[in-house]
């Protein structure tokens, strides 16, 4: 596997409204573990669409991993131009920082937002251009990643395409591990 697409919930879907929420570090730790293992097995590129939440936290994790594995690259393919338009200023600044550090940035449709069809095109692009999908997603709590997860599963039924998941139970295990380590 050379290219993995990463996605997951938006912050509000997780009840997270600030990047310093303790849940963010837990999610980043889970992402770090998965991505580091993939890098050690030959992963070269991580691709995200730049949406707030899991995707931008993934970018931060990639930047951390690049210290030890500088050949790992991050690409941000936005579904449309100026997707950050209308975001709060601190979220725009955070997003612009991530874009400034990414190895590749492009827009899939090369137009500003016109219709939900652009999200469908984004999902198709990600599944076509990647070897696997990693999603912070639990089918017990459907949310915005549902459609790309379904597309990945369909591709996996007909080709060698893998979907990997970080479930709520995985995050709970990390929380319990942290509590155990802090109690010692």
Swiss-Prot record:
Signal peptide (residue range): none
Gene3D superfamilies reported in the protein's UniProt record: 3.40.50.450
Pfam families: YpsA
SUPFAM superfamilies: MCP/YpsA-like
InterPro entries associated with the record: YspA
Stored PANTHER family: UPF0398 PROTEIN SPR0331, UPF0398 PROTEIN YPSA
Similarity comment text for this entry: Belongs to the UPF0398 family.
Protein name from the UniProt record: UPF0398 protein BCAH820_1652
Provenance organism: Bacillus cereus (strain AH820)
